[in-house]
From Swiss-Prot:
Keyword RNA-binding among UniProt keywords: no
Gene: PKP2
Lineage of source species: Eukaryota, Metazoa, Chordata, Craniata, Vertebrata
Tissue: Expressed at intercalated disks in the heart (at protein level). Expressed in gingival epithelial, endothelial and fibroblast cells (at protein level). Faintly expressed in tracheal epithelial cells (at protein level). Widely expressed. Found at desmosomal plaques in simple and stratified epithelia and in non-epithelial tissues such as myocardium and lymph node follicles. In most stratified epithelia found in the desmosomes of the basal cell layer and seems to be absent from suprabasal strata. (Microbial infection) Abundantly expressed in tracheal epithelial cells following influenza A virus infection (at protein level).
Subunit structure: Interacts with DSC2. Interacts with JUP. Interacts with KRT5/CK5, KRT8/CK8, KRT14/CK14, KRT18/CK18 and VIM. Interacts (via N-terminus) with MARK3/C-TAK1. Interacts with DSP. Interacts with DSG1, DSG2 and DSG3. Interacts (via N-terminus) with CTNNB1. Interacts with CDH1. Interacts with the RNA polymerase III (Pol III) complex proteins POLR3A/RPC155, POLR3F/RPC39 and POLR3C/RPC82. Interacts with CTNNA3. Interacts (via N-terminus) with SCN5A/Nav1.5. Interacts with ANK3/ANKG and GJA1/CX43. (Microbial infection) Interacts (via N-terminus) with influenza A virus RNA polymerase subunit PB1 (via C-terminus); the interaction competitively inhibits the interaction between the subunits PB1 and PB2.
Keyword Secreted included in the entry's annotation: no
Phenotypic consequence of residue 673 to V: In ARVD9; uncertain significance
Alphabetic keyword roster: Cardiomyopathy, Cell adhesion, Cell junction, Cytoplasm, Disease variant, Methylation, Nucleus, Phosphoprotein, Repeat
Stated name of the protein: Plakophilin-2
Gene Ontology molecular function: any one: transmembrane transporter binding
Protein family per UniProt: Belongs to the beta-catenin family.
One GO cellular component, as annotated: nucleoplasm
Stretches forming ARM repeats: 341-383, 385-424, 427-467, 571-616, 671-711, 719-758, 763-804, 807-849
Source organism (scientific name): Homo sapiens (Human)
Length: 881
């Protein structure tokens, strides 16, 4: 099976594999010399057998050298370089690296004997010193054959490292030369092929045990310019870097917190702590700590010594003091000897809350130790209300707040994470933070730190999980509705409690009703000046302005905090309206998202909810300088002979007509601050969001803001109503909201129509656009749920407004078949009085007032007693609408 070689290789026999398999190869095997060459050697005075013997020795040396450099471990299967790559691709040789499972090809660049060899691949680039005196033929010139070898099972003397897709690189320590076996051990890379992998660990007894891992992401730590992934088994060389180094600006523990923060089955609203899960050998010289981004470990190496961890179900393992100090904070130590015995105490003692709180002493502990203790507290308070209470009893909150002054990013980040879990759903801890002057301390850190992770710890949860985990919008909390006397508007105020996946430290504090006014007093100005105004781009006109110190998540988190604060009450609303730049920035940001065709932006939802709350009772709470201008004509209205007009006094129809005849105050072309709240630009902005956004809470807040602005009968509500209906054609958008699936949006839309229908000049237009829709949403029977009762009552009052002064509108209501529904609901008032039944009774009484329709009623088989009876008369005369 010999094949003639190329001229440069004349005299050598080609491989015994046939051409049908290998084709035209460009390299030769290390076969024996040809007979012709042996004859030539014999004629030159050298014995052929001697040449043959030397050639065999040379062949064996080169084969062993190439085998040592090129083999790659894959479990128990090793691949040598005796078979060309494409032979594997022909599936003639079965191997784990064939086909789609093959990793990125590695390139080898070997210089002369004793020089450094570099290797690179998907996992990074590394160097090693080789003592081989033979150079490797470059792959571009030769394709050496490959052989398959089956190696024995893994043993404690030979550890395999499993790596994630993150970069892997390793450098030998100064003065160390990696020979063949050491370099092979350092280069054993197993590419992750499954989400679940079994990692071979070494127990104290020398036996192997397996640990199941449910996450392919592994933590990565920085050391100089080299990025090493964390080892999943004991390192082959204990002298190599194992521990974190202090002073690193950011740890992968915090970066990967973003990847694993929101996982299925977790209690919402908390920070996933950064806690090491690792087996630990009793040999301190070889003890290592490696961190994993997942806490889903089903089994630890019990033989390896005590450790502590908590998986997703809350089950405890053990964490030693030494482990917490080595890796709990996520910031690495270059030397284990950094800790003295007096500092560590017994490193194998189990870490407890008591011990962790006692370690929070800035004057006596290294920053890395403090970070480890704070991280442990953060971890223990995750899903454990008892741990939160215990830390409070140990005065741990005070110690954590005092540590905020430490000028160390890692300490500040760990402390903020611990505080964030401590205040989650624990009002006592929230009040404790406030009483200990914690809010100003947090704001000081927020202003001074340049670390984005710390800012996010203070304002909200981790960053990027929103897209990965379907980040839900902030849930609006509808407070008990308050009715403004004589205004006909039922206004709800939006707020956000401790929400799933939205639970920053300040956000959680602002969810406590007792702390909202405190937050407004201490945090409003700082958050507005340092976050809201810079990011929104106002007043420069840019949108938005993310930079190295701010990003969208921080802006979103702060708007969520302000959203809670805006529901504090009258004093809080007034303070927020007076805050320079707040309303301007919010309006500027929302207008920018609409212009960029992003009406579903989740920060826009928060901004609109804030504006919605600030428009609540606006007419009554306006500063005197605005009310004097708006109501100047209102006070000049006089009635003839000072007599009260109508049975309802100042709320009668004739007085409303006089209000509507009063000229409206001129609108400022350049509004500022609170003036934006009723400006036509903002009204148009709300209508755009109603029409374009698909987020229910954005729609509800926009409708609610217009509802608040149109509540009442003064110049401002009348002007806003006319703008909505006549100038901006807003009825078409409001009408569509009557048919959405969300009942809260539907209820708010009907409440807005009810306010609009109080304007006499708009009633016919409203009836023309919406009367059939109003009838369609009225149920056939008495509603049972509170929300449906409110919706039905508002629909009946709206119909009552538009039929009172119009015979034609009343006839249209009769023709649509709505009277039968109304009578059925009114009848329910006899046995279960509610708002809907009362509103239906009022509407029936008003319908009978149109005498010209009596014949039509009788023709439709209705009697007078269906419209006028003791029930309907009582409801009508008790009406204070």
């Amino acid at each position: 099976m010999a094949a003639p070689g190329a001229p440069a290789e004349y005299g050598y026999i080609r491989t015994v594999l046939g051409q049908q398999i290998l084709g035209q190869l460009d390299s030769s095997s290390l076969a024996l010399p040809s007979e012709a060459k042996l004859k030539l050697a014999g004629s030159s005075g050298r014995g052929g057998q001697t040449v043959k013997s030397l050639r065999i020795q040379e062949q064996v040396q080169q084969t062993l050298a190439r085998k040592g450099r090129s083999s790659v471990g894959n479990g128990n299967l090793h691949r040598t370089s005796s078979v060309p790559e494409y032979v594997y691709n022909l599936h003639l040789v079965e191997n784990d690296f064939v086909g789609g499972r093959s990793p990125v090809p590695k390139t080898y660049d070997m210089l002369k004997a004793g020089t450094t060899a570099t290797y690179e691949g998907r996992w990074g680039r590394g160097t090693a010193q080789y003592s081989s005196q033979k150079s490797v033929e470059e792959r571009s010139l030769r394709h050496p054959l490959r052989r398959l070898e089956i190696s024995p099972d893994s043993s404690p003397e030979r550890a395999h490292y499993t790596h994630s897709d993150y970069q892997y690189s390793q450098r030998s320590q100064a003065g160390h030369t990696l020979h063949h076996q050491e370099s092979r051990r350092a280069a054993l890379l197993v590419p992750p092929r499954y989400a679940r992998s079994e990692i071979v660990g070494v127990s104290r007894a020398g036996t192997t045990s397996r640990q199941r891992h449910f996450d392919t992401y592994h933590r990565q730590y920085q050391h100089g310019s080299v990025s090493d992934t964390v080892f999943d088994s004991i390192p082959a060389n204990p002298a190599l870097l194992t521990y974190p180094r202090p002073g690193t600006s950011r740890s992968m523990g915090n970066l990967l917190e973003k990847e694993n923060y929101l996982t299925a089955g977790l209690t919402v609203g908390q920070v996933r702590p950064l806690v090491p899960l690792q087996p630990v050998t009793q040999n301190r010289a070889s003890r290592s700590s490696w961190h994993q981004s997942s806490f889903h470990s089903t089994r630890t190496l019990r033989e390896a010594g005590p450790s502590v961890a908590v998986d997703s179900s809350g089950r405890r393992a053990h964490l030693t003091v030494g482990q917490a100090a080595a890796g709990g904070s996520g910031n690495l130590l270059t030397e284990r000897s950094t800790f003295t015995d007096s500092q560590l105490g017994n490193a194998d003692m189990e870490m407890t809350l008591e011990r962790a709180v006692s370690m929070l002493e800035a004057d006596h502990m290294l920053p890395s130790r403090i970070s480890a203790a704070a991280t442990f507290i953060q971890h223990e308070c995750f899903q454990k209300s008892e741990a939160r209470k215990r830390v409070n009893q140990l005065r741990g909150i005070l110690k954590l707040l005092q540590l905020l002054k430490v000028q160390n990013e890692d300490v500040q980040r760990a402390v903020c994470g611990a505080l964030r879990n401590l205040v989650f759903e624990d009002n006592d801890n929230k009040l404790e933070v406030a009483e200990l002057n914690g809010v100003p301390r947090l704001l000081q850190v927020l202003k001074q730190t340049r670390d984005l992770e710390t800012k996010k710890q203070i304002t909200d949860h981790t960053v990027n999980l929103r897209s990965r985990n379907g980040w839900p919008g902030a849930v609006a909390h509808a407070c008990n509705p308050s009715t403004l006397g004589g205004q006909g508007g039922r206004i709800t105020r939006s707020g956000v409690r401790d929400q799933p996946d939205q639970h920053g430290l300040l956000w959680n504090l602002s969810s406590n009703d007792k702390l909202k006014n405190l937050m407004i007093t201490e945090a409003l100005l700082t958050l507005t000046e340092n976050i809201i105004i810079p990011f929104s781009g106002w007043p420069e006109g840019d949108y938005p302005k993310a930079n190295g110190l701010l990003d969208f998540d921080i802006f979103y988190n702060v708007t969520g905090c302000l959203r809670n604060m805006s529901s504090a009450g009258a004093d809080g609303r007034k303070a927020m309206r007076r805050c320079d730049g707040l309303i301007d920035s919010l309006v500027h940001y929302v207008r920018g998202t609409i212009a960029d065709y992003q009406p579903d932006d989740k920060a826009t939802e928060n901004c609109v909810c804030i504006l919605h709350n600030l428009s609540y009772q606006l007419e009554a709470e306006l500063p005197e300088k605005y009310s004097q201008n708006i109501y100047i004509q209102n006070r000049n209205i006089q009635t003839d002979n000072n007599k009260s007009i109508g049975c309802f006094g100042s709320r009668s129809r004739k007085v409303k007509e006089q209000y509507q005849d009063v000229p409206m105050p001129e609108e400022k072309s350049n509004p500022k601050g609170v003036e934006w709240l009723w400006h036509s630009i903002v009204i148009r902005m709300y209508l755009s969001l109603i029409a374009k956004s698909v987020r229910n809470y954005t729609q509800e807040a926009s409708l609610g803001a217009l509802q608040n602005l149109t509540a009442g009968s003064g110049p401002m509500p009348t002007s806003v109503a006319q703008t909505v209906v006549q100038k901006e054609s807003g009825l078409q958008h409001t009408r569509k909201m009557l048919h959405v699936g969300d009942p809260s949006v539907k209820k708010t839309a009907i409440s807005l129509l009810r306010n609009l229908s109080r304007n006499l000049s708009l009633q016919n237009e409203i009836a023309k656009e919406t009367l059939p829709d109003l009838v369609s949403i009225i149920p056939d029977t008495v509603p049972s749920t509170d929300l449906l009762i409110e919706t039905t009552a508002s629909a009946c009052y709206t119909l009552n407004n538009i039929i009172q002064n119009s015979y034609q509108n009343a006839r249209d209501l009769l023709n649509t078949g709505g009277i039968q529904k109304i009578m059925a609901i009114s009848a329910g008032d006899a046995y279960a009085s509610n708002k809907a039944s009362k509103a239906a009774s009022v509407l029936l009484y008003s319908l009978w007032a149109h005498t010209e329709l009596h014949h039509a009623y009788k023709k439709a088989q209705f009697k007078k007693t269906d419209f006028v009876n003791s029930r309907t008369a009582k409801a009508y005369h008790s009406l204070k609408d």
